[in-house]
């Protein structure tokens, strides 16, 4: 029997065109690092070494506001000043290129189709730059964030940059108030989220089997990716890949989205390498959770008990019951 929170938690396209990634793909997620050993006996820095092999990545080791984290629901704080998220697509569907980066499935939007987000913990409007998928080799793992110590089968991360202050995501990523990442947990089910179904159907996902493969998707509705909830959890953290800049506000939606078992199997068949190299599954592409270090985890879910956990003492402490939503 599946569990869902009573607090509610957590958190067709017209045509598809193939493109050449080798010629046109941006240099994304570059650098000498990995989530796991690439080949047994070889050394490519895994997460525990990221901050040791490159001085520019030292925050990966010494930072105190790192992501992901384990969300302990008993420690969450109600913040009455958190407003609902507002997604502005301009009433248009968008196009984007889906890449196999060797580490992630990454969907990057066409620059002619802008999607902005505001509200929630944000003072500024932020522009969607990338949608990134994390997933496990088995259903019991795959998400970067944990809920009461439990992982989910995957996690969708929508990475936005502050376009009011910065000209691009590279500048924003290393600057104050630079990034907002919306995170949505993935569970395996008999049905599929309509947006993820576009990304993960067989005709699409098999086009990006190997590293540097790319595929163009058109007629995408970003709002279809979001679960049917206005509730979320938020905290201040970092990028979860090197250089681990501590410039990200995280928003974790309070319901999961679903993909089918066949779609998850297709993800696990994606290779970290190019066709001429040994096959290594992209799965288990998640960073281990990092210490919370006294950071507040806030929510817009209203509960009645007063709490003193938050430094500004303006919030209320969460009181929750496990329902039939997420946990098992």
Swiss-Prot record:
PROSITE patterns: ALPHA_CA_2 (PS51144)
GO molecular-function terms, A-Z: carbonate dehydratase activity; hydro-lyase activity; zinc ion binding
Expression sites (tissue/organ): Strong expression in brain and central nervous system.
Pfam families with a match to the protein in the record: Carb_anhydrase
Function of the molecule: Does not have a catalytic activity.
Similarity section: Belongs to the alpha-carbonic anhydrase family.
The protein's name in its UniProt record: Carbonic anhydrase-related protein 10
Native source organism of the sequence: Homo sapiens
Lineage, broadest ranks: Eukaryota, Metazoa, Chordata, Craniata, Vertebrata
């Amino acid at each position: 029997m599946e569990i869902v929170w009573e607090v509610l938690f957590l958190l067709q396209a017209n045509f598809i065109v193939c493109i050449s990634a080798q010629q046109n793909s941006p240099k994304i997620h570059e650098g000498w690092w990995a989530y796991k050993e690439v080949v047994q006996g070889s050394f490519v820095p895994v997460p525990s070494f990221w901050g040791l092999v490159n001085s520019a990545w030292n925050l990966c080791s010494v930072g105190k506001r790192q992501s992901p984290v384990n969300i302990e629901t008993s420690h969450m704080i109600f913040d009455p000043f958190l407003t609902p998220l507002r997604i502005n697509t301009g009433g248009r569907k968008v196009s984007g290129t889906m890449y196999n980066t060797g580490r992630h499935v990454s969907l990057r939007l066409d620059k002619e189709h802008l999607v902005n987000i505001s509200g929630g913990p944000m003072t500024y409007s932020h522009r969607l730059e990338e949608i990134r998928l994390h997933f496990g080799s088995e259903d019991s793992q795959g998400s970067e964030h944990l809920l009461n110590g439990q992982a989910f089968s995957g996690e969708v991360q929508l990475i936005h940059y502050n376009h009011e202050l910065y000209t691009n995501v590279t500048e924003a990523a290393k600057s104050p108030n630079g990034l907002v990442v919306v995170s949505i947990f993935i569970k395996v089910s008999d049905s599929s989220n309509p947006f993820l179904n576009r990304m993960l159907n067989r005709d699409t996902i098999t086009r990006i089997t190997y590293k540097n493969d790319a595929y163009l998707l058109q007629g995408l509705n970003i709002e279809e990716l979001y679960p049917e909830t206005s509730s979320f959890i938020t905290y201040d953290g970092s990028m979860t890949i090197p250089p681990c800049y501590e410039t990200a506000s995280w928003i974790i939606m309070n319901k999961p989205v679903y993909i089918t078992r066949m779609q998850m199997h297709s993800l696990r068949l994606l290779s970290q390498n190019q066709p001429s190299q040994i096959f290594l599954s992209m799965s288990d592409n998640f960073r281990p959770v990092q210490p919370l270090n006294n950071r507040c985890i806030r929510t817009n879910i209203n509960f009645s008990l007063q709490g003193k956990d938050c430094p500004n003492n303006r919030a209320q402490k969460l009181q929750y019951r496990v329902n039939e939503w997420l946990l098992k």
